[in-house]
């Protein structure tokens, strides 16, 4: 009989086995290392995190699920990982219902879930449980990490961001998603918390000599397992330029600086995600050497409306 219970510190190795068995079955997916999985779920110092559960059968972990912060207050991301040998037995559904109940107790407005398009049955499954397609994205990779040439843009400088720039970073974020529907309305304090929590390095494009800051590139470290060993990689989480300053080469200049930063850190690959209907961004990334790895869809459940299907 399968039992769902909160995560305990000794569960990490069992979770890792489930994670890597699942990755082996997925096209384009990378395995995890022990340290990478612990970092991803905030399991340092053997703490028990809120929002992480395992499914256990016969003393073995066969699946796990957790809630992670999304990009704005009131949103959470649901992740359910089931060992391939255990799929189709209802374990994933039981964990998903558990996550929805936990998210509702936290007064969450929206719960998101990500599924690769190579497995359309999972999207159908999420829709059965009340989720709806939200945004369709492409995962891209640059390997080896070679930064192409990018000329400086006259009248603008690219520099590392500091705490005083967080208000400008929030304004750029909000201008990139004016309806606030995708990532919510950012503010300076929220952006500062994000940088501190993620360890991101942010570079900005600033009009000289007196401003304003008009673009940003956010780079952070990720970790995958290659041949069973943890390998650090670069991840470009956000690249944005204020609408009035586009078509000047600032986006390319910021992207190249982000790639250079990844190379300086010795990361063997750079990864990013982009909306599939964002043709200018797709062209920019392809022109700098990024190649498509896999497509995925983000689904969203509005928790204030409708129960989870049984």
Could you describe each region identified by the protein language model?
Residues 3-15, 157-171:
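A short beta-loop-alpha structural element at the N-terminal edge
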Residues 9-12, 19-106, 115-116, 214-232:
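Conserved donor-binding loop and adjoining core beta-sheet/short helix segment
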Residues 49, 60-63, 121, 209-215, ...:
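Glycine-rich acetyl-CoA-binding "A-motif" of GNAT/NAT acetyltransferases
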Residues 69-75, 83-154, 299-301:
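Acyl-donor-binding surface of acyltransferase catalytic domains
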Residues 78-80, 111-115, 236, 270-274:
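Conserved hydrophobic beta-strand within the GNAT/NAT acetyltransferase core sheet
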Residues 88-101, 128, 238-241, 247-264, ...:
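Conserved acetyl-CoA-binding loop-helix of GNAT-fold acetyltransferases
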Residues 139-159, 166, 268, 273-279, ...:
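C-terminal "cap" of GNAT-fold acetyltransferases
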Residues 174-186, 193-207, 211-222:
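Phosphate-binding active sites in nucleotide-utilizing proteins
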